[in-house]
Amino acid sequence: MWASRDHLPEPDLGDAAPPGSPSSFWTSGLPRQERSTSRQRSRGSPSSTCVPYKVHALATFECSATSHASRLWQTLQQFWADHISRPFSPRRPPLRRMPSLSTFYLLDHNTRQAELGLAYGAPCMRLSNQAFVFRGGRWTTESQLARTRSPLLSRTAWGWKAQVQRSKSQVLLEENNYLKLQQELLIDMLTETMARMHLLEKQRNPEVIPTAAARAGQRKMRKRAGASAGVLMIQPCALDSQ
């Protein structure tokens, strides 16, 4: 393959080259300097056209890279704010209402133990149609155990009933005292209200009470006069009948 003319070395023959030399054919009658400048222009023209394209591509890549980095940073900040930076503050449960509580919490320890305490029974066993109970380190029949436990059970039941009666009587006494206090307060309020009402009536109508008293006196006088006239009318009739 033949090499192109652009890559062949040029011999240094000075300013003048003899006719028939290779340089005379390559120059084709053009000066040496003009040929070199034209060659430089032809070589520099493609690079000058490629530079703006490369700059534009680099700027586009930088913009896309910065936008992608900013998106990643925003996503990381949002994740940090949602999951890590917030303090742990769980929601408080709703408050328990008093009516939902059982009334056994108001009782004393002994009553609660008697009502809600666990009562484990003694181990039992049955042999040949007879029941045995292990209590006090020995096996006893159920009939003997019933005889021995009957007074104990009666005492404990009586004591528990007496305690319940005491607590009930105490509650009733407190309720009675509270009702008495309310009754006295209502009576005082009623008395004060009646006194205010009479005072307002006197201030608004001061002549009502005297007129009412006068009317009552007139009625009494009329009754007395009617009674005396009736007596006088009866006397002549009585004399005629006699």
Curated annotation (Swiss-Prot):
Note: 'Chibby' is Japanese for 'small'; the gene was so named for the RNAi phenotype seen in flies.
Subcellular location: Cell projection, Cilium, Flagellum
Predominant cellular place of this UniProt entry's protein: other
Gene Ontology CC terms, in alphabetical order: sperm annulus
Keyword Nucleotide-binding (UniProt): no
Domain of life of the source: Eukaryota
Record GO biological process: spermatogenesis
Binding partners and assembly: Homodimer. Interacts with CIBAR1 (via BAR-like domain); both proteins form a ninefold symmetric structure at the flagellar base; are recruited to the annulus in a mutually dependent manner and regulate annulus positioning.
Organism: Homo sapiens
Sequence segments annotated as region (Leucine-zipper): 172-186
Alphabetical list of InterPro entries matching this protein: Chibby_fam
Main function: Plays a key role in the correct positioning of the annulus, a septin-based ring structure in the sperm flagellum, serving both as a physical barrier and a membrane diffusion barrier that separates the midpiece (MP) from the principal piece (PP). This positioning is essential for proper sperm motility and function. CBY3 interacts with CIBAR1 to form a complex which localizes to the curved membrane region of the flagellar pocket. By doing so, may provide stability and rigidity to the periannular membrane to prevent membrane deformation.
Biased composition (Basic and acidic residues): 1-10
Highest classification ranks of the organism: Eukaryota, Metazoa, Chordata, Craniata, Vertebrata
Region span, Disordered: 1-49
Family: Belongs to the chibby family.
Statement: the UniProt record of this protein carries the keyword Lyase: no
Consequence when changing residue 102 to A: Reduced interaction with CIBAR1
Keywords of the record: Cell projection, Cilium, Differentiation, Flagellum, Spermatogenesis
Alphabetized PANTHER family for the sequence: LEUCINE-RICH PROTEIN, PROTEIN CHIBBY HOMOLOG 3
Protein name: Sperm annulus positionning complex subunit Chibby3
Gene name of this polypeptide: CBY3
